[in-house]
Amino acid sequence: MAYESLASEPNDGVTDHNDDALYVGIDTLKAARDNIKGWYLYSFSSEPFVVSAVATYVPLLLEQFARINGVQLDDHNAPCSTSSSDKCVLGLFNNRVFVDSSSFALYVFSLSVLFQTVVVISVSGMVDRWKTISFRKNVLVTFGMVGAFATVLISLLNETQYYSLVVYYIVANSCYGVINVVGNSLLPLFVDDLVRLQPDHTVPAAEELSLDTDDKDGLTTVISGRGASIGYSAALVVQLMSILLVRLSPSKQDIQYAVFFVGLWWAVWQFPMYWLLSDSIIPDQQSNQAIANGRYYDIDGSIFTFVNLSSLKYGWKLLGEALKHATLLRDVVIFLIGWFILSDSLTTINSTAIIFAKTELHMSTINLISLSIITMISAMVGAFAIPQIVSTSLHVPPQRTILLIICWASIIPLYGMLGFIFQSFGLKHQFEMFILGVWYGISMGSVAAVSRSLFTIIIPKGRESTFFSLFSITDKGSSIVGPFIIGIVTDKTHNIRYSFFILFILLVFSLPIFKMLNVERGKREAEEISKLHVNIDPIQD
């Protein structure tokens, strides 16, 4: 096994055409363009899992399995009725612990995110040490196939296998977390290769939008935006197909048919992605240019070659380095604390609302999938319209924009709380759920767009990867806390409506934290820290 590396990072997107050692008889430009297409397929194949399965299908299945295997709250000797109006609890660990059927789904979601976070940090270190496209491709496909297989297995379970449902869901969600991080890490490499291999600086994606290929940030944004659009389009297709499959099921409510389709979709699109992704630049093993710069080349790209304790520990070393850098920047710390609370609140609203709609409003499976589609479309509109209207047209700075979005989002739990006072409104009817679905979608789409742009302003240039790893971990890891707290509240009250109080408090609590953010001070501190030459040797143990 030979490990080689490129001489240096690309110099302003200019290729040294005299460096023939970099080219080993392959159509490098075609390979670079194919990599972009393969990256689009990564989003196209996996996005339906998180949009459809994680957000809608699996929470419904968890609540359904818990209810079918549960007992009545008032009489643990009486089996739970399939009617959604009964209060049911599920006995766990040989009936040593009883949890509300709604809480069960929330606890499992929290547990899955915990496992996902640990796996992602560990695997990301391994990927950062061996940066070949071939190796990362194998990581993508391996975890993609395992995740897809686990998703298909969920669809084959019978209703008594609730422990198996938990295990398969944790495996699938952890696999998605890995491919999400690895997929995002590939984009900068693809853009670098595309720019340096294009001799006349006419990259098609840049031409169409009047971007110079020297503007790597602009080109990256264009390709990233297209990938996100392709992913959402795939999720929309899967959701529409899921409605048809559920309608064709014997009970016309069997959501496992939809889960099977999600797993099948995820698996099938791995094959063209595998064929498209490859190393567009591979150094000659005899070349004097094979000098370490961090891009290590394993020609075989086997994932199993690098699974060792040293590689797994490296991810945690990188996390420690990122935390050390973050503590030097006051406004980055303020942002991450606020983002932890805000992201947790918004994510928990989704998982809570889907269970609330099923158990309290008795919405059918078809209506719940339709609600998910409406929310997704609204998120796409929010991601595009809010930054354009509020930030560009009205010239509202990002910090104030995110405060407005928090106020907008807090209306959702506040409206749910009104149900304790009024009998005619306050999430008492199904149509109200569709209205709030639009409201929530706009919140999610806009906050995703604005938060990233705001964070970009206050982090040091040249260390974006380090700080965005913290952003990602904060974003994903925060989802451990909210569902767990809501699960406890629902267990104590056996009324999931009380969760709206917790969600409202969390959203309001994030307001003064973001208010403390000083963007100008953050920019100054970021410029100062960017002058420091702090780094980790990627091959040190």
From Swiss-Prot:
<dbReference type="InterPro" id="IPR050495">
    <property type="entry name" value="ATG22/LtaA_families"/>
</dbReference>
<dbReference type="GO" id="GO:0000329">
    <property type="term" value="C:fungal-type vacuole membrane"/>
</dbReference>
<dbReference type="GO" id="GO:0032974">
    <property type="term" value="P:amino acid transmembrane export from vacuole"/>
</dbReference>
<feature type="transmembrane region" description="Helical">
    <location>
        <begin position="163"/>
        <end position="183"/>
    </location>
</feature>
<keyword id="KW-0926">Vacuole</keyword>
<dbReference type="GO" id="GO:0006914">
    <property type="term" value="P:autophagy"/>
</dbReference>
<keyword id="KW-0812">Transmembrane</keyword>
<feature type="transmembrane region" description="Helical">
    <location>
        <begin position="431"/>
        <end position="451"/>
    </location>
</feature>
<feature type="transmembrane region" description="Helical">
    <location>
        <begin position="402"/>
        <end position="422"/>
    </location>
</feature>
<protein>
    <recommendedName>
        <fullName>Autophagy-related protein 22</fullName>
    </recommendedName>
</protein>
<dbReference type="Pfam" id="PF11700">
    <property type="entry name" value="ATG22"/>
</dbReference>
<dbReference type="InterPro" id="IPR044738">
    <property type="entry name" value="Atg22"/>
</dbReference>
<feature type="transmembrane region" description="Helical">
    <location>
        <begin position="257"/>
        <end position="277"/>
    </location>
</feature>
<feature type="transmembrane region" description="Helical">
    <location>
        <begin position="366"/>
        <end position="386"/>
    </location>
</feature>
<keyword id="KW-1133">Transmembrane helix</keyword>
<keyword id="KW-0472">Membrane</keyword>
<comment type="similarity">
    <text>Belongs to the ATG22 family.</text>
</comment>
<dbReference type="InterPro" id="IPR036259">
    <property type="entry name" value="MFS_trans_sf"/>
</dbReference>
<feature type="transmembrane region" description="Helical">
    <location>
        <begin position="103"/>
        <end position="123"/>
    </location>
</feature>
<feature type="glycosylation site" description="N-linked (GlcNAc...) asparagine">
    <location>
        <position position="308"/>
    </location>
</feature>
<feature type="transmembrane region" description="Helical">
    <location>
        <begin position="499"/>
        <end position="519"/>
    </location>
</feature>
<keyword id="KW-0029">Amino-acid transport</keyword>
<feature type="transmembrane region" description="Helical">
    <location>
        <begin position="470"/>
        <end position="490"/>
    </location>
</feature>
<feature type="transmembrane region" description="Helical">
    <location>
        <begin position="332"/>
        <end position="352"/>
    </location>
</feature>
<keyword id="KW-0813">Transport</keyword>
<feature type="transmembrane region" description="Helical">
    <location>
        <begin position="41"/>
        <end position="61"/>
    </location>
</feature>
<dbReference type="InterPro" id="IPR024671">
    <property type="entry name" value="Atg22-like"/>
</dbReference>
<keyword id="KW-0325">Glycoprotein</keyword>
<feature type="transmembrane region" description="Helical">
    <location>
        <begin position="139"/>
        <end position="159"/>
    </location>
</feature>
<comment type="function">
    <text>Vacuolar effluxer which mediate the efflux of amino acids resulting from autophagic degradation. The release of autophagic amino acids allows the maintenance of protein synthesis and viability during nitrogen starvation.</text>
</comment>
<feature type="transmembrane region" description="Helical">
    <location>
        <begin position="228"/>
        <end position="248"/>
    </location>
</feature>
<keyword id="KW-0072">Autophagy</keyword>
